[in-house]
Amino acid sequence: MARQLRAEQTRATIIGAAADLFDRRGYESTTLSEIVAHAGVTKGALYFHFAAKEDLAHAILEIQSRTSRRLAKDLDGRGYSSLEALMRLTFGMARLCVQGPVLRAGLRLATAGVPVRPPLPHPFTE
């Protein structure tokens, strides 16, 4: 049990470090060695959780997508006009982007068109 918790914490640390570097330097300009150093983990730990830099990008995009969907779902059925719901969603995303690099990096990856395999589901389909 403790080993699993430690593995989850290491994975989260790696994702946070990668997101910080992707956000500040860009995906293409960031190397795995820089992520390892920034996270304070070994290359073995990184490769245990992620086979390639693309897998890190995929994990960050999944978190960003899941968070965006949760925000939208929380607004659904509250009686807001379309414009007010969009404004609340935008403010919610902006608030989360200020709090940490993962969502900022996810948005940057999504808008930069970084290809990830397997592709994430399109946000406007079920």
What are these regions (language model features)?
Residues 1, 50, 113-117:
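A short, mixed-charge helix-start or loop-turn motif at secondary-structure junctions
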Residues 105-113:
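Short linear capping/connector segments at secondary-structure termini
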